[in-house]
Amino acid sequence: MRHRKRTAKLGRTGEHRNAMLANLVCSLIRHKRVTTTLAKAKAARPVAEKMVTLGKAATVHARRLVAARLRHPARTLHGSKAEREAWRKDEDVVRILFEELAPSFKERNGGYTRIVKLGERQGDAAQRAILEWVDFIAGAPSEPAGSGSATHTAGAKK
């Protein structure tokens, strides 16, 4: 019987599900927003929120817990060139989480992500959704207006 089991299985084995959720959260940390199915977004949301909570702790132990959850255990620095590159990308995700994301959520007590429903996918009618950080603004410029160089060039013709 499956009484009181809250984990969404998503039609996968436990190892496959954990790897998929870790990859989804890594993509969310790297790209600030991820388009996926509604079920996967709902399953990845608590994982992402726990990672930010650990990131706010900013301890060595928290960093190791995040790395253990988000990294593939077989990747090492001593493997092939592809494995070393994958390990460095995973390490970048941990760095981004602890140095950029977690400090921006220092004043917020939970609720770091939002799920925006998109509608159905054309091929199989699966509900799609965007999983993104609450403070993420899609078309925001990277630097404030007026701080850049002048918009007109010296020799421009009219």
Which ranges hold each PLM region?
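Structured, basic alpha/beta domains of bacterial-type, RNA-associated proteins
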Residues: 1-19, 23-158
